[in-house]
């Protein structure tokens, strides 16, 4: 999911919010429990895999009022994955992007990076959220048609319609507890604890903040409906205390035919 910002101050707030909400995003949108025709034991196996990726995760620095300069320092001092040199791809092992900028890479005749090289490098930083010319949110599993617009609507309500109230809420949270909840959420889902409450509680509270934000935006369709209509699926999940992953696990236990299962 890609969202924009209108100033550095706006970016700082939005980036801190979305990183603080990563555990909630994992739990609320968990939908990758079945792996290789088996129950993986995780609500979001996809999130678990990304947590084990050396270039992924939720860096502590992301909670320290990350501004453009700090993110730039983070990105240029991040290891290279590969280098595209003409039509050839070379391993970037043992080099940082700052080495590239300093002309230290002998394998490419010490040439300096282009804007395309920078864009490629930024796209290989697999953190839960990342900055390009926009903010990219990466914590949500994909879902069916009935909830396809729920993720964009949920985050739009929070980040565009109710930014300050949400920022005030998450500013009270401890980053170490957020990171711990992030590590537990792929397996425990709504039962994960954060700041003394489970993620079901926080999901419900944040859904209300999002709903309020979408009402504040008052963007209407041709039928005079506002954007809160897209939150309906999430409201059902929270009311029933189950995730999309729970639904899939329940159906899977009754039907081993995955083709039929996904058709449903």
Descriptions of predicted regions:
Residues 24, 28-31, 128, 161, ...:
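A structural signal for alpha-helix termini and helix-coil/disorder junctions
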Residues 2-130:
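Loop-rich catalytic cores of soluble enzymes, especially ATP-dependent carboxylate-amine ligases
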Residues 210-264:
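C-terminal amphipathic alpha-helical interaction region
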Residues 129-130, 134-226:
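Substrate-recognition/cap regions that form aromatic- and gly/pro-loop-enriched pockets
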Residues 46-57, 182-191, 237-249:
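Short, charged low-complexity intrinsically disordered segments located at boundaries
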Residues 68, 94, 115, 119, ...:
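Alpha-helix initiation and N-capping motif
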Residues 13, 20, 27, 73-77, ...:
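Charged/polar, solvent-exposed surface patches and flexible loops
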